[in-house]
Amino acid sequence: METVLVINPGSTSTKLALFANHDCLAEETLRHSVQELAPFENVVSQTSFRKQMIAEFLETHNIIQLAAVVGRGGLLKPIPGGTYLVDQQMLEDLRTERFNTHASNLGAILANEFAEKYHVPAFIVDPVVVDELQPLARISGLKGIQRRSVGHALNQKAVARKIAEDLGKTYEQSNFIVVHLGGGISLGAHQKGRMVDVVNGLDGEGPYTPERSGALPLVEFAQWILEQELTISQVKKLIAGNSGLKSYLGETDLRHIQAQIAAGDQTANYYLKGMCYQIAKSIGEMAVVLEGTIDAIILTGGAAYSQTVVQEISQKVTWIAPIKVYPGEMEMAALYEGVNRVLTGEEQALNYSEAKIEQE
């Protein structure tokens, strides 16, 4: 039995899983308190601390042999989607935080530690920096500024593969609009196995979300920034974490918001409907990218558990394509499946050092 260790580091947790033959043999989420992490100067310095806990997990499950180790991909250079072999250039970029710091940077670093111990390869799959934008999609409208591809690539691509399989097709044969509904919302136009355009909420595109602003009237927002004398870090925090439903209702949890609506709160109802309205508009935008040839519109992420949200969006876009709902996320399984496709020869592992994105 070829067992794969999956490592998914978060800011205050490390999710671990063991997979074989498409089955999850064991899964555990290790929680890290603020006090435990306080002594560490940065994310990378937590390597030994987390490594010890992972070693204990493997010992508990009597793991003496592995086929491979896979970690969540961190902040790297923009690269096409796929499964990448962890190499020295990747490790150097992560250890030096060349492209910024994030807990996910530990994914490849920790995967490499255990890959060396078990004498097996280490991989990452579809990191957040996946960039498959077609050249026209990079144009922003102002010389000197390019649009970026940032979104929930791992979950978007994994769910798209699952829905394609359900439809009797491969991901590479299909066209999908994938909508990841969470605290942040991202949309992707998936065309024959590539995410050729996105709605990047992190940079202030698209619909408002439980905590993000989405697209704002630029002149009014610029005036607001000047009047409030905001720094660039404050602007980023505002549009990516303190806007949307949080700014209108003081709440980001859709369960609480829906309870307010059930109790007769018309204001909550108004702004939740507004969010769904804007999401539907962005789905229409992605439909244009795919020129109307769409196998399905896929709604995924935590907010896809909300029947209210799903219904509000669906009734506006069912004329475009069939709606498929896949609530939650499947990151751990997606990491395993990416590696399994390489181990079985279905795909070839990609080389990070040689990876380049399509520009013009």
From Swiss-Prot:
It comes from the Bacteria. Keywords: ATP-binding, Cytoplasm, Kinase, Nucleotide-binding, Transferase. It is found in: Cytoplasm. Its EC number is 2.7.2.7. InterPro entries: Aliphatic_acid_kin_short-chain, Aliphatic_acid_kinase_CS, ATPase_NBD, Butyrate_kin. One of its GO terms (molecular function) is butyrate kinase activity. One of its GO terms (cellular component) is cytoplasm. This is Probable butyrate kinase. It comes from Enterococcus faecalis (strain ATCC 700802 / V583).
